[in-house]
Amino acid sequence: MEIMPTPSGSGPSGAPEPHRVEAGLGAAWWGESWRIFVAAPGAWIGMVVVFAVVSTLLFFIPAVGGILQSVLTPVFAGGVMLGCHALARGERLTVGHLFEGFQGGRLAPLLVLGFIWLAILVGLAIVAVAFAYVALGASGVSALMALGADAQADYVTLTPLLLSAGVAFLVIAMICVTVVLLAAMAYWFAPALVVLNGEPPVSALRKSFDASLRNIGAFLLYSVIYIGLAIVASIPAGLGWLVLGPMVAGSCYAGWRTIFGPPADSRPAPG
């Protein structure tokens, strides 16, 4: 079974400017991710289980658990990208690749990336709350709180407010989805660019966003497929994520290889 060869010219000297690729590659990356998964399914599933256990333990640390979870996620993601890169070079994938982001000079830039990502998440939450408050107004928020607390509230009086609130929340939801997509565009390739190209964190976020924007068709097609796969993977008690989790990693690596590799490599290798 053939996996994408390692793109020539990749290394710690920095990533080239991203290429424009066909929109259809957004689907092809998922096909390539399956080949990456079946090349070492045991190691991939082991990484998912270990990551889930570590994330759960971090979450239950008082006060700082959630922060640590968000900050360390790019560190683990960097290790996974190194694992994908090892497979592309014909090397053996192990669960230990999950922790390679903690080694050498990789940890500091990945932690910086994690703190930036945490700031983005906090900013998104603040923006969502602010939009809700502005859309409804202080009196509207108070009225909705009263409705939740008082079963005898005047529903006739509150009906127009509830209707306007529904429209406002729909608009807010659309804005939030747009902002989340923009954030995802900046983060998509960032861990790979840090560990595989030696990009500084801010530069990695910029190049990832630029790559996504230049290839918005592929990015949107990729995202739509991801949503469908995520729904299916979540149905059997979330067990499908044992496969989809590694496929997400593999698809990110495939996207990095085609967009930041040499133009001649802009298509996945046949399986």
Language-model segments: residues:
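Interfacial aromatic "cap" segments that immediately flank transmembrane helices
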Residues: 23-54, 92-123, 160-175, 182-234, ...
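Residue-level recognition of pore/gate-forming positions within transmembrane alpha-helices
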Residues: 51-52, 56, 70, 74-75, ...
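Membrane-interface interhelical loops and short interface/amphipathic helices
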Residues: 135-159
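Selective recognition of hydrophobic, aromatic-rich stretches within alpha-helical transmembrane segments
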Residues: 2-18, 61-96, 122-139, 161-199, ...
